[in-house]
């Protein structure tokens, strides 16, 4: 009987040994949770080879410093002095996983610990630290970032896992909240060749801000002021009333306070919005609530202060043009803009009707005043002061409305003066003189408004129908345009064509700079900018043509001056494409053009327009209002929606 019992015990022991040694290298997580099976020397050797391939040291490959005996030594109680067994049982998988993670995060230090016999004790210490639920996620994040710093051989195509996935796998395997289960899942992914997507802990962002900009807690007022200056916020960053973001962005950044003990792998990592939300455990579906926004703020501050995202190169723009395409498309767009000057010929299409040309020219003259003043106040002034950048930040266009109030004040006095002249009793001689108001009693036969009016006699003396050619019609309606002996003009009116041409030339040069810079960026930006320039150049050039005609120039002279000033846009275009023009230089050019426009419109065009006499004053008053309000409306819409023109 005794021999039979001994035989049964021997068979049972043999079965157990065979079971322990013959277990296949299953997943470490399933091996840990089942508590059955073991890892033999072959499986451990393969695991150690994988670990050696996944890390690199500061001076190159780390080399293989861990042996199978070191791994088997993890299966004996610390200080037992017993030799390692032939296999590593399932109950020691948690310690093996912790020890492997230590090697992946710090290969040099782990090799020294293994030689000193401290590898197992340090693995137990790591497991003890991660057992706290509050320390598990931050601890894993710290380990993964160290592993990323030491990782070798990773490619962008490798499947990456993050901490939430590791936690879910541990829960699914029946080890919720277990540090050993999470580390075993991590080691399974190491064996399968996965990479790891680590994220910093929420506290890291707060610590970064305080370590870099505060010598103590809480942060002092001076330190907060320095922090706000670096971020470009606060009163000092917006000291001038124009809120010029261009100046704030060009200011040299305040250097970070160097701290040797606060450096981290995360200091140079640029995080996406999804990464930031994941770091704080926020769901993409739920979004960011006001309460969560307060938590996210340190992360955004850290990204701004560290400059991690500023050094990354931008991806190539798909719609960028080649150098030859920039010149081709830019030249075509500028040519179309220059053809606006030729549209002045439209004024001659209605000369078949007596008196119509006079009112057409007066309408376009008022349109020129509205377009030029609107362009200077609503369009160019915001660009000069850098106020157009506010539209990119989602702010309300409040500066535009304030500038519109300036034009409203101008329009109020315009109405007051016109209504005052219309409602008061008029001199009978004004009615007899006709639409031009040429009275023999007014300054030698010419009033101050003579340049902006047509001769009265020609409007009252029609020519026979058989003499109605276009040239005759122009001469009939406005003989001073074709007469080789022009009428006598006042000195200020003789200067008006040159001032209009000079202002147009400077403005068109600046437009060419803008078009060239836009096409250098992309064809979409170039097309949008060209359309915007065309919108405000069309009424502007038509009005200028009318003003030049009324200043005593012939049709040919007015067209030549308009075309000459428009051609400067090509010079600006080629300068921008060839050498490039900075935003600051363009602002100075536009500032000079703004002053020229305001002087021409308010000191020359508007006073002369107000002194026009006509037998139908209310009709002329209506046409002047249509021109003024039309020009201002076009430029107001352009100023409000110019940045929204996209294709």
UniProtKB/Swiss-Prot annotation:
It comes from Homo sapiens. Changing residue 453 to A: Reduces endocytosis. GO terms for molecular function: identical protein binding; metal ion binding; monoatomic cation:bicarbonate symporter activity; zinc ion binding; zinc ion sensor activity; zinc ion sequestering activity; zinc ion transmembrane transporter activity. This is Zinc transporter ZIP4. Changing residue 303 to H: In AEZ; uncertain significance; Loss of zinc transport activity. Decreases location at cell membrane. Retained in the ER. Residues 236-255, 458-484 are annotated as: Disordered. The chain crosses the membrane at residues 328-348, 360-380, 403-423, 499-518, 527-553, 559-579, 587-607, 618-638. Changing residue 309 to Y: In AEZ; Decreases location at cell membrane. Retained in the ER. It holds the Pfam family ZIP4_domain. Changing residue 200 to L: In AEZ; Loss of zinc transport activity. Decreases location at cell membrane. Retained in the ER.
